[in-house]
Amino acid sequence: MSDNAIRPRPNPWQYIRYCYGARLPDSMRDWVRNDLAGKGAAIRMMIRVAVPAVLVLAPFWLIPTSLDVHLSMTLPILIPFVYFSHALNKVWRRHMLRVHNLDPELVDEHARQRDAHIHRAYIERYGPRPDPND
């Protein structure tokens, strides 16, 4: 059995509410942990921010005009959405981990595992880092 088969998933209504800040039941903590700290979490969060922006901007494309006018109407609004979703990604994921009573440091877990060999090589070459309190 795969991990997804035993991990409870939110229903569509719960998922929509969760995407925009609602808390899921404790039975779904493993799913939340994987969603917010697992592989691809940053991209998932950016997509969740972009979807409402695209839905709001889509009617502008129904106005009969040229492509450059369409782009000049929508891109100045869409680009900041994408920019801020990237800039505030870890902040929002840490907040959502706290909301679900999970450790906010899980956000960096994937990067720590990915870069562990770099830290080991540094310690082997230069020794452990000095304690700043000494």
UniProtKB/Swiss-Prot annotation:
A GO-annotated cellular component: plasma membrane
Main location class: membrane
Record's keyword terms, sorted: Cell membrane, Membrane, Transmembrane, Transmembrane helix
Cellular compartment(s): Cell membrane
Highest taxon, organism lineage: Bacteria
Pfam families registered for this protein in UniProt: DUF5313
Recorded topology in the membrane: Multi-pass membrane protein
Record field: transmembrane: 49-69, 71-91
InterPro entries assigned to the protein according to its UniProt record, in alphabetical order: DUF5313 (IPR035197)
Name of the protein described by the UniProt record: Uncharacterized protein Rv2742A
Lineage, highest ranks first: Bacteria, Bacillati, Actinomycetota, Actinomycetes, Mycobacteriales
